[in-house]
């Protein structure tokens, strides 16, 4: 099932999702480094990465929602897409709450702030797996004419426009 939100022939959601996943996961890593080294600069940097991750997650959600709405009803893909989407709303909420708790003092986050981010990271592993299931097993966002020798997507877009 082809994506309904594409740029230059590729699904926008798949292009954007690397930003929140990378930024949010790295903010967790920086929490761990800060705890191991007692270096508050890692906590502060993680705080800013977390904020950018939340914002980029909201941006990635828009084309994801567009693609979700195009999935046929009463399919396994629709059910998994729903759990994936709701789960990612929860992930974003957990990280946003952690970010808010850190806002006044990003160099020394509370245990609650670290716990919320850790919970968000754990949930993101599951929702990321669901996203992989949608694409890799169920073909959501995959071009209908995809095959091992398919022409590049830019060439295909020019052929369609002609």
For each of these PLM feature ranges, what is it?
Residues 1-162:
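Short amphipathic, positively biased membrane-proximal segments
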């Amino acid at each position: 099932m082809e994506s309904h939100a594409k740029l230059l022939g590729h699904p926008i959601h798949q292009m954007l999702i690397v930003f929140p996943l990378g930024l949010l996961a790295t903010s967790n890593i920086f929490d761990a480094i800060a705890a191991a080294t007692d270096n508050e600069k890692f906590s502060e940097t993680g705080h800013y990465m977390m904020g950018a991750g939340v914002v980029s997650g909201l941006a990635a959600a828009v084309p994801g929602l567009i693609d979700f709405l195009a999935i046929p009803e009463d399919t396994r893909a629709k059910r998994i897409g729903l759990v994936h989407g709701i789960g990612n709303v929860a992930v974003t909420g957990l990280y946003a709450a952690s970010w808010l708790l850190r806002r006044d003092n990003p160099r020394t986050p509370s245990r609650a702030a670290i716990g919320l981010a850790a919970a968000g990271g754990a949930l993101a592993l599951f929702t990321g797996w669901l996203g992989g299931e949608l694409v890799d097993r169920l073909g959501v966002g995959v071009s209908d004419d995809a095959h091992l020798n398919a022409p590049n997507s830019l060439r295909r877009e020019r052929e369609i426009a002609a």
